[in-house]
Amino acid sequence: NDTVHDFTKDPIETYIDGYWVKAKGTTLGADNGLGVAAIMAVLEDNSLKHGPLEALITKDEETGMYGAFGLKPGTLKGEILLNLDSEDEGELYIGCAGGIDLTATLEYKEEAPAADLVARKVTLKGLRGGHSGLEINQGRGNANKLLARVVHDVLIEFDSQLASFEGGNMRNAIPREACAVLVFNPEDTEGLEDYIKEYEAQINAEYAPIESGITLTIESVDLPAAIVPAEIQDNMISVLMACQDGVMRMIPTVPDTVETSSNLAIVIIGEGKAEVRILARSSCDTMKEFLADSLTACFAMAGMKVELSGGYSGWQPNVDSPILHAMKLSYQQQFGVEPAVKVIHAGLECGIIGANCPGLDMISFGPTLRSPHSPDERALI
């Protein structure tokens, strides 16, 4: 914030710190300025011997991949695509996940609670969260899933009613926190408090050592003016319990790599409306469609209206890719070690470009970068 810089005209001030190239007070722009620089270097070097080349430089990759979406079929003449947007030297990427957003909504008529009831707010915190693609396979807890389970059991054990439920705030992040307001008989107060305390210990035991420090607290709040009708309450908690969350399938041909997953990202219930948002991912487009259909059916059974949006294609890995074998051989000859072959469970432009230009043999690689999109960004020399 203390750096005055006009990115439309001011040059990036770079310097070398040990083995790293850094920028003074701004982002370095190596993601993906280094890729563009590499393309320009090849194009201007007349001493290099190679066949016909095309240079594809897209816009807005970080904010929505709009350039890749705008690529028309038939624009590219080449049959091989070298994507330069990966961030670890020595790694070759041969696949990525596509995604689709699911939003389920329901409007309902609120009811007034009996005046002699009391209310408590139950809050679940302390989860690690993380990226819903890259870290979905870590076994971390989802706050929306866990709190739905808690509320489900409380509704069975105690004569209680749901007033509101809220958790998560980003579709591509595993939710770390969630809270619910419950209404019940005053004589059950001590029993409910003890139950919540025991539940906290149970959840921590289940998720140790992946999660450490999950808290489940209960606090007194004013009696709300409205609660969720019993039938709607039961349907909503049931669908949150039943819907797919986490890893659904691994890639058969690439060990220890997620193919298909979903993230129960955002839940808001209250004030006469329920809304659930899920991000589904898969490197296999047909599996992504199957997951979206399965989730749609699940929420439809709860009486919710479902809308799918923001879909983009995945890049299904081909372990027999000719460019993969050529790149592996070239890397071994140059550096004496075999490169790592990976699939990323997140979006790359390759998925979109491959859908617009079928038949491309694609691979993604690049230099080692750290802390992109921040003033701490650096590129390894």
Task: Report the location of each language-model feature.
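Active-site metal-coordination/substrate-binding segment of hydrolases
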Residues: N1-P52, I57, E61-T63, A68-G70, ...
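Fold-level recognition of mixed alpha/beta catalytic cores in primary-metabolism enzymes, strongest
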Residues: L53-A143, V151, L155
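His/Asp/Glu-rich mid-to-C-terminal helical/loop segments that flank catalytic regions of hydrolases
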Residues: G74, G139-E157, P186-T189, I232-M241, ...
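Active-site-adjacent substrate-binding region
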Residues: N142-F165, P317-L360
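A short beta-alpha structural unit
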Residues: M170, A180-V181, T215-I227, A265-V267, ...
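Short amphipathic alpha-helices in soluble, non-transmembrane regions
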Residues: E190-N204, F290-F299
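Hard-cation-handling environments
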Residues: Y195-E259, N263-E271
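Zn-dependent metallopeptidase/amidohydrolase metal-coordination segment
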Residues: P252, E259-A274, F335-I381
